[in-house]
Regions:
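Catalytic center-proximal scaffold of phosphoryl-transfer enzymes
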Residues: 1-163
């Protein structure tokens, strides 16, 4: 499952327009897209009440803090962070501040998306072959490099605004 929220202009009870949020939940396997809205709120309560006791094994999202409760083992949902959102944040850090660390992440994500994933599509890989590729030594090495750099940056106390 994928989940994201985005802002939109809302008018509630014929009052003045204001910024509000609409949520989207996608189940690609079942080919289902659900939009949900709760008075324009972006709070965690909107998500937790919508999901309720649904039997969801994993949910992929950006790093917005409303999703952090998914990391709680009691929740039973594995929280997967979206690499595309990480790429976008790295790109933004590079464009706005020429952050050298951002270049590292952009290069690694480029290797995953534009080299490996493009190859899978161009060669018409079956889902089984794509899974093998995504679990290959090359992919694992790239992901390990990213993880090591994130761990290093966190231990060094890099400023939030940089990457």
């Amino acid at each position: 499952m994928n989940c994201d929220e985005t802002w939109c202009r809302v008018r509630l009870n014929n009052k003045k327009q204001r910024k509000g949020y609409i949520w989207c939940l996608i189940n690609k396997a079942a080919k289902i897209v659900i939009f949900f809205f709760d008075e324009g709120s972006r709070g965690r309560k909107v998500l937790t009440e919508f999901l309720g006791d649904a039997n969801i094994k994993a949910l992929k999202s950006d790093a917005y803090n409303a999703y952090y409760y998914l990391d709680d083992k009691e929740c039973g949902i594995e929280h997967l962070c979206c690499l595309e959102h990480a790429r976008a944040k790295s790109y933004q850090a590079w464009i706005q501040g020429k952050c050298e660390e951002a270049k590292f992440f952009l290069a690694k994500i480029e290797a995953l998306y534009n080299n490996l994933e493009r190859t899978y599509k161009e060669h018409g890989f079956t889902p089984e072959l794509i899974k093998e590729g995504r679990n290959s030594a090359v992919t694992i090495e790239i992901i390990s490099d990213i993880r090591q750099r994130v761990t290093q940056l966190l231990s060094d106390g890099i400023e939030k605004s940089e990457v």
